[in-house]
Structure formats: structure tokens, C-alpha cells
């Protein structure tokens, strides 16, 4: 019995020690939620990545995606590409608030997904610069990824791959 009292006394003392180091901070639920004005404005932009070019229109709606006349699930069957494309809406808490209409050509699947994400982010930035720009910029969604395939050089098999060289 005495041991239990000692353990509880130690536990209470440890709890008091720990609480002395913590601060009173507001949790995410207590923080006042910033009200966004209801926007009925459409935005349009162009996104590019590698060889892919995406012309994107974002209009107020129910969250429907139309890419070259097909749905998002149909055009990008890979869930990673679907998530990648939808990130600008997630980070701004605007999922389901806008419909996306896009025309994409050139490049491969990954390049097209990157181009579409940039186009969507630029469109959302155009709609409401004051509220959206800082968040999108911090996440890196407004930056064009300038990496492209290096050209093949004469005398080499590929861009950098050369014939094996023997010094002796």
C-alpha cells in the first residue's frame, strides 16, 4: 500500500514538473477560422512541365474535373497523379468548390500531371491573389519546374554516356 502511494506521489510530481515546461497555447480547434469570401470568379492559366503543356480553366462548381473531355480518374488512373493534381485545392481548403476544365498535350503522364498542377495553382492564384498567393508560394506550387531532358551530344551514345576509354 505504501509503495502505491509513493508511486502516485512520484507520478503527480512528474506531472507537475512537465506542466511547468508547457505553455498555454490555443489548439487548432480554438483558433478563429478565417472566413473566405464566396468567390464566383473563374480563373485561367497555363502550366508547363517537361514537354507537357496544360491550359486550365477553374470555374465555381462542385469539384468536377474534365481533362481533354475525360474525367480525372479516367485520364490519370494512378492515384499519385490524382493526388498531385489536387494538392493546390487541398492546401487552400477549396476541395469541391471549383470545377476544372483542362486541355493537355505533349509529354508523358507525369509531366502532364505536373503541368496540370501548376496550371490549377496559377488559376487559383489569379482568382484570389490576396488569400491564396502566400500559401501556394510557400508550398512551391507557383514555381515552374525547369528541369528538362539534356540533349544528346555528337560522339556520345546518349547525353553523357561515352564509349569505354582505356588509358593503356
From Swiss-Prot:
Gene3D superfamilies: 3.30.230.10. Pfam families: Ribosomal_S9. Residues 1-29 have a biased composition (Low complexity). One of its GO terms (molecular function) is RNA binding. InterPro entries: Ribosomal_Su5_D2-typ_SF, Ribosomal_uS9, Ribosomal_uS9_bac/plastid, Ribosomal_uS9_CS, Ribsml_uS5_D2-typ_fold_subgr. Residues 1-36 are annotated as: Disordered. Keywords: Ribonucleoprotein, Ribosomal protein. One of its GO terms (cellular component) is small ribosomal subunit. GO terms for biological process: translation. PANTHER family: RIBOSOMAL PROTEIN S9, SMALL RIBOSOMAL SUBUNIT PROTEIN US9M. Belongs to the universal ribosomal protein uS9 family. This is Small ribosomal subunit protein uS9. It comes from Paenarthrobacter aurescens (strain TC1). The lineage of its organism: Bacteria, Bacillati, Actinomycetota, Actinomycetes, Micrococcales. The gene is rpsI.
